[in-house]
């Protein structure tokens, strides 16, 4: 009695191991039945009929599960697109990744959405230029010029001061003394006027002297001529009287 019970237990155990192996192989190889093992013939003893009956009964649920599992996975793999790939190892298969195609409805919805304006457009550049071209006289150099107006030259990027009247310097902090200039100018004018008057007086005196000398010479000649005529007349009168 012990030998048939031991053989029955061994056969059931072997069937369970074979069924689990077949199920795992079916999951890995996508429903291909490779290496299915048939149950061993076992012992041709008197208890062989009982073993075969028990094996058929125990095989039914495992076989149905295997068939349903193979059918489900085969349908799933049939529905999937055929993607080219390469096998690194017997147990690992590397396949390429393909981006899923967008539906037409999604594309239409995306096209219907209003286009947003880019921030880096003309408006953005204008704002940047405005920020760059901000006048530093209004903020940083507000109190730079003491007695003048701050002016920013964009081409040279230099801040200068336009000084008020009578002020000069980098920050218009120095003032010119008008009183000293007036005194100097008055003195110079007085000196110039005096020189002009002196020169004019000298010139007038010289002209007067020259004219006086010329007139004297002229009158002296005329006087001498008149005197000579008078003498000649007197001499002629005396001569006629003697004769």
Swiss-Prot record:
Positions with biased composition (Polar residues): 55-67
Compositionally biased spans, kind Basic residues: 114-135
Subcellular localization, as worded in the UniProt entry: Membrane
Chain ranges of the EGF-like domain: 133-173
InterPro entries documented for this protein: EGF-like_dom
Biased composition range(s): Basic and acidic residues: 98-113
A GO term, aspect molecular function: cytokine activity
Segments crossing the lipid bilayer: 190-213
Top-level lineage group: Eukaryota
One of the record's GO cellular component terms: extracellular space
Positions of the pro-segment in this chain: 25-96
Disulfide bonding pattern of the chain: 137-150, 145-161, 163-172
Membrane topology listed for this record: Single-pass membrane protein
Signal peptide range in chain numbering: 1-24
Transmembrane is among the record's keywords: yes
Keyword annotations of the record: Cytokine, Disulfide bond, EGF-like domain, Glycoprotein, Growth factor, Membrane, Signal, Transmembrane, Transmembrane helix
GO biological process: dichotomous subdivision of terminal units involved in mammary gland duct morphogenesis; epidermal growth factor receptor signaling pathway; epithelial cell proliferation involved in mammary gland duct elongation; ERBB2-EGFR signaling pathway; G protein-coupled receptor signaling pathway; glial cell proliferation; mammary gland alveolus development; mammary gland branching involved in thelarche
Family that this chain belongs to: Belongs to the amphiregulin family.
Biological function: Ligand of the EGF receptor/EGFR. Autocrine growth factor as well as a mitogen for a broad range of target cells including astrocytes, Schwann cells and fibroblasts.
The protein's name in its UniProt record: Amphiregulin
UniProt source species: Rattus norvegicus (Rat)
Gene this chain is encoded by: Areg
């Amino acid at each position: 009695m012990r030998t048939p019970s031991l053989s029955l237990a061994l056969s059931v155990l072997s069937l369970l191991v074979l069924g689990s192996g077949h199920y795992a192989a079916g999951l890995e190889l996508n429903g291909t039945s490779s290496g299915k093992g048939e149950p061993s013939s076992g012992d041709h003893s008197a208890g062989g009929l009982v073993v075969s009956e028990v094996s058929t009964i125990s095989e039914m649920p495992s076989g149905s599960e295997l068939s349903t599992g193979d059918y489900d996975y085969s349908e799933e793999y049939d529905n999937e697109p055929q993607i080219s790939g390469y096998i690194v190892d017997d147990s690992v298969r590397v396949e390429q990744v393909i981006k899923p195609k967008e539906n037409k409805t999604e594309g239409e919805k995306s096209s219907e959405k209003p286009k947003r304006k880019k921030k880096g457009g003309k408006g953005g550049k204008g704002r940047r230029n405005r920020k760059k071209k901000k006048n530093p006289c209004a903020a940083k150099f507000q109190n730079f010029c003491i007695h003048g107006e701050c002016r920013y030259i964009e081409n040279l990027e230099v801040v200068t001061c336009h000084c008020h009247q009578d002020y000069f310097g980098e920050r218009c902090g120095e003032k010119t003394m008008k009183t000293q200039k007036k005194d100097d100018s008055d003195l110079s004018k007085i000196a110039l006027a005096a020189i002009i008057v002196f020169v004019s007086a000298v010139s007038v005196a010289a002209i007067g002297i020259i004219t006086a000398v010329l007139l004297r010479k002229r009158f002296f000649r005329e006087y001498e001529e008149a005197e000579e005529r008078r003498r000649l007349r007197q001499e002629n009168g005396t001569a006629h009287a003697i004769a």
